[in-house]
């Protein structure tokens, strides 16, 4: 099995190294095509106004000056065009990609691009808690990643579907199993704009979430990782809401 590995945190990110290790538990044919620089939050964007620069870092390892979607396209349609990968793995992201994160995530987008190109694809992210990124427990994803991927491949990934996997903020032995979960929803009232001024008095802003108690919904990815379970969420490329499609069609016919 040929595996293409990408991410959005960049070619030198520790999560990419973690995912390479996971991939090598599954296959000895692992290729890496990742962004030259951090592309967190770029979602499914493409570089349409700038050329893509490709740099070979080492054997089977490439960096692209572009987005995660660019990287997957370059990997599938250029670097590996004569022998396409059988699986695209994107991650391991530095931080969870649950709830609304899915719409912003470059990690999810890397898997999404693989799905668009007709290749099975899985996005993987490692949550962190109050200790912040400095105390991120990569060992959790490293210990459980290969087994979760094997199970997903055994179940099968249908065309047009990608799978989002989130590892909880705990030690490997503290994981309470796997929860197949729906995409959750945060309390958006907690989103704040933090206004500041630089040394010259010019304003600038940070987006931030207020710290407040929040009870995630049952059966969601948010709930799963809060309970130290690995959240597995199938996502569909087709964003059409079928019930609403029927309702709108009936209304326009009236």
Swiss-Prot record:
<dbReference type="GO" id="GO:0005737">
    <property type="term" value="C:cytoplasm"/>
</dbReference>
<dbReference type="GO" id="GO:0008253">
    <property type="term" value="F:5'-nucleotidase activity"/>
</dbReference>
<feature type="binding site">
    <location>
        <position position="9"/>
    </location>
    <ligand>
        <name>a divalent metal cation</name>
    </ligand>
</feature>
<dbReference type="GO" id="GO:0004309">
    <property type="term" value="F:exopolyphosphatase activity"/>
</dbReference>
<feature type="binding site">
    <location>
        <position position="8"/>
    </location>
    <ligand>
        <name>a divalent metal cation</name>
    </ligand>
</feature>
<dbReference type="GO" id="GO:0008254">
    <property type="term" value="F:3'-nucleotidase activity"/>
</dbReference>
<dbReference type="InterPro" id="IPR002828">
    <property type="entry name" value="SurE-like_Pase/nucleotidase"/>
</dbReference>
<keyword id="KW-0378">Hydrolase</keyword>
<comment type="function">
    <text>Nucleotidase that shows phosphatase activity on nucleoside 5'-monophosphates.</text>
</comment>
<dbReference type="GO" id="GO:0046872">
    <property type="term" value="F:metal ion binding"/>
</dbReference>
<feature type="binding site">
    <location>
        <position position="93"/>
    </location>
    <ligand>
        <name>a divalent metal cation</name>
    </ligand>
</feature>
<feature type="binding site">
    <location>
        <position position="40"/>
    </location>
    <ligand>
        <name>a divalent metal cation</name>
    </ligand>
</feature>
<comment type="similarity">
    <text>Belongs to the SurE nucleotidase family.</text>
</comment>
<keyword id="KW-0963">Cytoplasm</keyword>
<dbReference type="InterPro" id="IPR030048">
    <property type="entry name" value="SurE"/>
</dbReference>
<dbReference type="GO" id="GO:0000166">
    <property type="term" value="F:nucleotide binding"/>
</dbReference>
<protein>
    <recommendedName>
        <fullName>5'-nucleotidase SurE</fullName>
        <ecNumber>3.1.3.5</ecNumber>
    </recommendedName>
</protein>
<dbReference type="InterPro" id="IPR036523">
    <property type="entry name" value="SurE-like_sf"/>
</dbReference>
<keyword id="KW-0547">Nucleotide-binding</keyword>
<dbReference type="Pfam" id="PF01975">
    <property type="entry name" value="SurE"/>
</dbReference>
<keyword id="KW-0479">Metal-binding</keyword>
């Amino acid at each position: 099995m040929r595996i293409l590995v990408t991410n959005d945190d960049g070619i030198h990110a520790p999560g990419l190294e973690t995912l390479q290790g996971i991939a090598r538990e599954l296959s000895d044919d692992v290729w890496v095509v990742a962004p030259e620089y951090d592309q967190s939050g770029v979602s499914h964007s493409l570089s349409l106004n700038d050329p893509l620069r490709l740099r070979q870092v080492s054997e089977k390892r490439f960096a692209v000056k572009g987005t995660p979607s660019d990287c997957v396209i370059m990997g599938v349609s250029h670097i590996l065009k004569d022998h396409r990968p059988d699986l695209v793995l994107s991650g391991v992201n530095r931080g969870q990609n649950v709830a609304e994160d899915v719409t912003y995530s470059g990690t999810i987008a890397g898997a999404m691009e693989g799905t668009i190109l007709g290749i099975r694809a899985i996005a993987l992210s490692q949550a962190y808690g109050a200790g912040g990124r400095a105390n991120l427990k990569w060992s959790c994803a490293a210990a459980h990643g290969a087994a979760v991927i094997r199970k997903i491949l055994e179940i099968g990934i249908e065309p047009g579907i990608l799978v989002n996997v989130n590892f909880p903020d705990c030690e490997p032995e503290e994981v309470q199993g796997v929860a197949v979960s729906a995409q959750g929803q945060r309390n958006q009232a907690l989103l704040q704009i933090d206004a500041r001024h630089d040394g010259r008095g010019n304003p600038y802003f940070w987006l931030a979430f207020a710290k407040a108690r929040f009870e995630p919904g049952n059966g969601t990815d948010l709930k799963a990782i809060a309970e130290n379970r690995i959240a597995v969420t199938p996502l569909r490329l087709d964003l059409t809401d079928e019930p609403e499609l029927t309702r709108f069609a009936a209304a326009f016919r009236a």
